[in-house]
Amino acid sequence: MSAALTETPAWQALQAHFETLHSVHLRDLFAADPGRGERLTAEGAGLYLDYSKHRVTDETLDLLVALAHARGLPERRDAMFGGEKINVTEGRAVLHTALRAPRGSDVLVDGRNVVPDVHEVLERMAAFAQQVRSGSWLGHTGKPIRAIVNIGIGGSDLGPVMAYEALRHYAQRELTVRFVSNVDGTDLVEKTRDLTAEETLFIVSSKTFTTQETMANAQSARAWLLSALGDEAAVARHFVAVSTNAEAVQKFGIDTANMFEFWDWVGGRYSMDSAIGLSLMLAIGPDGFRELLSGFHDMDEHFRTAPLEANLPVLMGLLGVWYNNFFGAETLAVLPYDQYLAYFPAYLQQLDMESNGKHVTLDGQEVTYQTGPVVWGQPGTNGQHAFYQLIHQGTKLIPCDFIAFAQTLNPLPLPGGAPHHDLLMANVFAQTEALAFGKTLEEVLAEGVDAALAPHRVFDGNRPTSTLLVDRLTPRTLGALIALYEHKVFVQGVIWDVNSFDQWGVELGKVLARRIVKELGADEPELSHDSSTNALIRRYRERR
């Protein structure tokens, strides 16, 4: 960028506007504009966004869109979709969007159309999934597969496990699907404790087939299998790989015909719609997986073509910048009111925090402003009985994303009362209303509350929320929802001028761990860390 972000006219215009708006209450904004709740909405790819309960005016939105133009967002978006190497620190294109491009599309990387490669892998995945799901893929002893265990970590785990839990309603119930990620042996032991080796298939997901945690778990899973079946040949019937390292895969004992590849233009946290999603395809079937991809593509097209002022990822991204950089908000709460989305906040933690948790700009200069927020959350209504107290009456401003579905997948009547889903949705609407408008001291006193107690019953309100209301949770709408957040993160990375597609921050600890693990196994060599680390290692040696 030619000028530091905070020195640009667009930023300074927003700063001046903030000084006049930051003390204005949402009560006043709604009172001045009776149609605000219907006007400040947007729709795309089957998702409906109500952003009227944000501390913004039309002028705010115009200034935010002007900032996006000033930072070159449309051009950067087109560069990403066009296959330019926008991951500058690794010299790579960023083309997770190609993973869901329809057959016949053209997406070029170094002059070569990669879409045929994507669909060739998808067809191989589908053929394999059909074999397993139909029972025609037999294990070493001739029994069909009844359990799938995905072994991966980071993007090779968080996306698949989130999507599997989200789409469990559509899964083949005869198949047990589990996910092992933590190098803590407890994870593998507990996930395999009640499984039968003869009927278990492991998917080892590691692009390089060298990821420390994944390969430790894979080797232990291999030993578990062989302890039951004895024959090395069994590995080829009970393990498949998602990788590009054919030599290492073959050495492990996996038939390379059962190795499903993906590409260096796919980042780990953006890879769940590649072969990394094989476990999900096994669960929901090839048709369901293709519907998921269609939902991703729906949002890709919306992001690529919709005007910025009506573009869901752009609006959500810019609103996040507004609170992060002007109001000083440090976190974002993601609150899905659907139990199937229990893992969605954890998935977004990696997507957002690994992407935009950066302290230097694209050209290596230290930033002078805040970048990515801390992302967290829990399904409703559980969170209401845990941390909503702080959101309502605490001293920290916490913008919230509420996600809800008009139709439940599990209608459950309540004898003598409203259906469960009506109870759930009533809480969605009540929470966003309470957060926006609160309750004044005068209103509390008018209810006859004792004057000494009344201050404790006051809700300041003016807490900003977005509400995403979707008709129904399906593979297609889930794909659109995930892509919405992918592109929102991209928008913010462009505004902050950071590389949203590398993750150097995870490297230093990994390097040190490789050194330390050798030191844990013996009293020598002499430790040469800081005094704290040395003391902790010695104590561990003594007490293990």
From Swiss-Prot:
Cystine links in this protein are none
* GO CC aspect terms: cytosol
Q: Which Pfam families match?
A: PGI (PF00342)
Q: InterPro entries annotated for this entry? A: G6P_Isomerase, G6P_Isomerase_C, Phosphoglucose_isomerase_CS, SIS_dom_sf, SIS_PGI_1, SIS_PGI_2
Where does it reside? Answer: Cytoplasm
State its role: Catalyzes the reversible isomerization of glucose-6-phosphate to fructose-6-phosphate.
**Identification of the protein by name:** Glucose-6-phosphate isomerase
Q: Which organism is it from?
A: Deinococcus deserti (strain DSM 17065 / CIP 109153 / LMG 22923 / VCD115)
